Regions:
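Residue-level signal for inorganic ion chemistry
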Residues: 17, 43, 94, 111, ...
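A short, charged helix-loop
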Residues: 153-163
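Conserved alpha/beta core of the MobA/IspD/sugar-nucleotide pyrophosphorylase nucleotidyltransferase superfamily
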Residues: 2-7, 163-237
Length: 237
């Protein structure tokens, strides 16, 4: 099922959509990535948008969803399987599908469970990649935050913390090196790229996102609450 991507165009940007989770918390007989929003499967929202701005798309799914997702794709999208319910394994599976070539510029990584991304977000990442080797969206925390201690909990200032989310874009060659050497798995410094960039003094760009469009769908109630928020916003446009 694994294919290798050969690219010819300069400044090639490749997308990896992570969709191999088992949907254990989704509370539906339908797999989360196949659940329909506005008559379109969740995963198709990200595929359709990213296909307009990136040269190639890799979608990482589990074997249970493979056949169903395959029916949704055109020939320009590569579909591969990862049956380990782990984000890092899915990223590695996607990277392993890309043939190492100087013609690849950047890799954009996105969670299929964030289907409400907008064209402006992707354009912003591409523009940011012209200056920074790494760019990523984040969300400000809106709920109270506490830290577990041996005696109970300590309340912490949420303004000192950010919630990292996708989409994120990084120089392909830099990411391949850092991921394989410092993230996966033997010499791991961190599960995230940011601490490693800090360690090596590599500049990056964090972009503030909107909860309405970047909130991750975990269970069925998330879809209902997000759709309701969209309806309210549309009434005031």
């Amino acid at each position: 099922m694994k294919e290798i991507i050969y690219t010819k165009a300069n400044n090639t940007n490749i997308g990896i959509i992570l969709a191999a989770g088992n949907s254990n918390r989704f509370n539906s007989k339908t797999s989360k990535i196949l659940y329909k929003i506005n008559n379109k499967p969740i995963i198709k929202h990200s595929i359709d948008l990213l296909s307009k701005y990136l040269n190639k798309i890799i979608v990482v799914v589990n074997s249970k969803d493979y056949k169903s997702v395959k029916k949704l794709l055109n020939k320009s999208v590569v579909l591969v399987v990862n049956n380990v319910d782990n984000r890092l394994d899915s990223i590695k599976t996607g990277l392993d599908c890309i043939k190492c070539t100087d013609e690849i510029s950047n890799v954009l990584i996105h969670d299929a469970a964030r289907p409400y991304i907008t064209p402006e977000m992707i354009k912003c990442l591409i523009h940011s990649s012209e200056k920074y080797q790494y760019s990523q969206y984040y969300l400000n925390l809106v709920d109270g935050l506490v830290k577990k201690t041996t005696t109970g909990f300590d309340v912490v200032d949420r303004n000192n913390y950010l919630q990292l989310c996708t989409p994120q874009m990084i120089d392909y060659h830099l990411f391949g090196f850092l991921f394989r050497k410092y993230v996966y798995p033997n010499n791991r410094l961190s599960c995230e790229i940011l601490p490693i960039l800090n360690k090596f003094n590599i500049s990056y760009n964090l972009i503030e996102g909107n909860h309405t469009y970047l909130r991750k769908i975990t269970n069925l109630d998330d879809i209902l609450s997000i759709e309701k928020k969209h309806e309210i916003q549309e009434r005031h446009i």
